[in-house]
Amino acid sequence: MYSTPAPPEVTRRNSEPSTRQGTLGSLQGEKGQIIFPGFVVLLTIILVIIAACILWSWKKQKKRPVPYFQVAPSLTLPPPRHRAKNIYDFLPRQQTELGRHQLSGFSTESLLSRASDSPEPEAPQANGSLQMHRVSVHTVEYSVNIYDNGTVPQMCRHLASSTHHVCVRTSRSNPSISSKESNDYVNIPTVEDTCETLTRIESTPENHLGLPSALRLEFAEGGHAGCGNATDHDGFWAPGPKCSDSLSDGDDLSQTSNDYVNMTGLDLENIQENRPRGAFQCCRDYENVPWVDTNESQLPTLEEVASSTVDHREPVWRTLSSVYHMAFQPSAQSEDSAMVHREEQSSEDSSDYETVLVAELEGRDWKQGPGTQHPSDEGTPGDLAGKLCEVVYPAGSLATETSDEDA
């Protein structure tokens, strides 16, 4: 059972192929181990190069110059350039301080004050026995509220049913009066309308009564003895419930406005009258006046008013039971003028205690103020006879007197 050994040549041939296989396997294993670390090293080198490039580019951008101007410290700033001149440098010093033009406001007071600086025109001498007297009203500022109460009766001879005529003479330098606080339209009638109105007033009968629907303040320009001549008159109309026929078509605009007209800041320094007119007496409005016994206190009151208002050039402002009380001294008349005494009328049913007083002073010569000539110096002592028509209305009503004109 024993085998014989193989010859040595055969043994060598069989061992050579196994050795070759072992060498090839070892070489492949070593080759794989060498490639992996090389790949890792190559990847690390690439990453380092990329990081270095990023850092280099960042430093390069940081060293790049800034495009905007760098602000230096305030101590090293150069002096500023001279700017353009202000447009207000050429203005006066006062306006330069204000920084703008000072606008001057337009007001009625400024116009009246400018007109008052102008010299007063000389009025012509009167042809009658009474010398012309000049009455100047000096007021600083006051307000006149005119109300139209349709239920209050009145007693005056020359007052028509459509207009309440108040004649106040003023100089030509004040042709118009405006009201800043009023929303009314002021319409000035023509000369023809004024003449027609005066003609209708003179032709009105004595027993014609009733409160007017429109109140007219007529400012004459001086130079004529009476109010009958309307050639130089300027009309100032305050609106009422109804308008007179003498109003023009444009006067309808005042129908839609309020029932009162405020005249504030009226300067009447240049008011001229050809004869003494009397005094203005006023006090607070919207208060009731109790009824008084007119038989005992009427005549003394009228005599006191007549004596106190004629002795002064300036009108006397007096307080009478908290109502607007305005009395005008009558104009001069001839010796043959008729004296009429009218009855007083009082409305006790009214809540406002209206009292209408009418009185006539017969055979009384009016004393003249200082610097004037007494009427008896030029004519007979009985040349002048006056009448005083005194009307008291509540809450801002006006009481005026109108006298008869020579036919």
Swiss-Prot record:
| Induction info | Up-regulated in T- and B-cells following TCR and BCR engagement, respectively.
Q: Which parts of the chain span the membrane according to its record?
A: 34-54
User: Where does the record locate the signal sequence feature?
Assistant: none
Looking up Pfam families in the UniProt record yields: LAX (PF15681)
Keyword set, alphabetical order: Adaptive immunity, Cell membrane, Immunity, Membrane, Phosphoprotein, Signal-anchor, Transmembrane, Transmembrane helix
Instruction: Output the superkingdom of the source species.
Output: Eukaryota
Q: In which tissues is it expressed?
A: Expressed in T-cells and B-cells.
GO function terms (MF aspect): protein kinase binding; SH2 domain binding
Q: Which residues lie on this side of the membrane: Cytoplasmic?
A: 55-407
**Extracellular membrane side:** 1-33
Instruction: Provide the positions where the record notes the PTM Phosphotyrosine.
Output: Y185, Y260, Y286, Y353
Tell me how the protein is altered or processed after translation: Phosphorylated on tyrosines upon TCR or BCR activation; which leads to the recruitment of GRB2, PIK3R1 and GRAP2.
Give GO terms for biological process.
adaptive immune response; antigen receptor-mediated signaling pathway; B cell activation; intracellular signal transduction; lymphocyte activation; negative regulation of MAPK cascade; negative regulation of T cell activation
Region annotated Disordered sits at 1-25, 109-131, 331-388
Its biological purpose is as follows:
Negatively regulates TCR (T-cell antigen receptor)-mediated signaling in T-cells and BCR (B-cell antigen receptor)-mediated signaling in B-cells.
Query: Tell me, how does this one assemble?
Result: When phosphorylated, interacts with GRB2, PIK3R1 and GRAP2.
The name this protein goes by in its record: Lymphocyte transmembrane adapter 1
> What species is this protein from?
Mus musculus (Mouse)
Q: Which gene encodes it?
A: Lax1
